[in-house]
Amino acid sequence: MITIDERDARPPFEQIREQLTDQIRSGSLAAGTRLPSVRQLAGDLRLAAGTVARAYSELEADGLLESNRSGTRVREVEPIPAEAREAARAYIDGVGVGSLDDAIRVLRVEWGNR
């Protein structure tokens, strides 16, 4: 299920993109799962069709979705193991950085120090 948080500073297309990415990577959305049409999801979320189309397009470019005349489906991707997701959550909760970019910068520095 996709939800849009109007208080979130991120644009709606990015919220859709991130939620679908998480669902695909966690295995909640299995390979071959057909997603709602752009118009259907836009109507359900009360968004412009172009907003949903942009999210789908970016997910397709990321290799997570494939579209054809019969619709948009989840591609086969290797899910991120539950242990890795749990470790990431613990890191996010404990690191005390302000943004994803800050967290990535910290990881890059520490990765280089290995």
Please give the residue ranges for each predicted region.
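Extreme N-terminal segment that seeds HTH/winged-HTH DNA-binding domains in transcriptional regulators
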Residues: M1-R34, E83-R114
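Short beta-strand(s) of the beta-wing in winged-helix/HTH DNA-binding folds
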Residues: A30, E60, L65-E66
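A short alpha-helical element within helix-turn-helix/winged-helix DNA-binding domains
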Residues: R34-L45
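Short, Lys/Arg-rich nucleic-acid/phosphate-binding segment
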Residues: L35, S67-V77
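Short, hydrophobic-biased segments on the C-terminal half of alpha helices
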Residues: Y56-S57
